[in-house]
């Protein structure tokens, strides 16, 4: 139940904002299918709270068969989102152009640290970097003392709230959203 009931969304497994975004979308009623790398199975926590409410599959994304499995999911999905560095989905054969060929209504969401272009686009993005460079870290802690890194991922969690996926209603062409945390 929830306002997103009836939406089918593919989460390309990653760290930080991706799993959180999928968790929130699932909490709001969306059907989330998490696509894990086959090599990652058994390496994470079995009690990862961000996986609640999701179904998941393990796929070898570097094989043609694995890519085809994901593209079959894309054919009936409302949205897909990922948080990889620029160009990764394209190299895998799962970029927005290919996904929209399979499903013209697909919403393709990207969450990266620094966006798809610019001087930091290919740099790994981590929450502490975002909140430091934006000045948010300076607001955390006691007056007159050095900043205190937060115990949660403020930037990532904020970025994880990609509820723009609701704009699925009637797009005239595939919708592509790129969100730099």
State each model region's role.
Residues 24, 28, 90-169, 173:
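Active-site-adjacent "lid/gating" segments in soluble enzymes
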Residues 10, 51-101:
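A structured beta-alpha segment of the ubiquitous adenosine-cofactor-binding alpha/beta core
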Residues 38-41:
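Helix N-cap at the beta1-alpha1 junction of Rossmann-like dinucleotide-binding domains, i.e.
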Residues 11, 27, 31-36:
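Short beta-strand "acidic-cap" motif of Rossmann-like dinucleotide-binding folds
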Residues 4, 71-75, 123:
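A short, aliphatic-rich alpha-helical micro-motif
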Residues 14, 61, 85-86, 112-113, ...:
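Short glycine-/small-residue-rich Rossmann-like dinucleotide-binding loops
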Residues 179-181:
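Hydrophobic alpha-helical segments, chiefly the membrane-spanning helices
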Residues 18-19:
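N-terminal Rossmann-fold NAD(P) dinucleotide-binding loop
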């Amino acid at each position: 139940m929830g306002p997103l009931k009836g939406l089918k969304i593919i989460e390309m497994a990653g760290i930080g904002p991706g799993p959180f975004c999928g968790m929130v979308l699932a909490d709001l009623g969306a059907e989330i299918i998490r696509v894990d790398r086959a090599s990652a199975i058994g390496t994470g926590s079995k009690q990862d709270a961000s996986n609640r409410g999701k179904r998941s599959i393990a796929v070898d994304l570097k094989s043609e068969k694995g890519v085809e499995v994901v593209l079959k999911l894309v054919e009936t999905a409302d949205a897909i989102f990922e948080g990889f560095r620029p160009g990764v989905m394209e190299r895998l054969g799962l970029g927005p152009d290919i996904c929209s060929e399979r499903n013209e209504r697909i919403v393709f969401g990207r969450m990266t640290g620094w966006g798809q272009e610019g001087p930091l686009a290919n740099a790994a993005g981590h929450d502490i970097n975002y909140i430091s460079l934006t000045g948010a870290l300076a607001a955390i802690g006691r007056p007159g003392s050095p900043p205190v890194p937060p115990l949660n991922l403020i930037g990532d969690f904020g970025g994880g709230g990609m509820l723009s996926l609701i704009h699925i209603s009637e797009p005239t062409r595939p919708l592509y959203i790129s969100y730099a945390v």
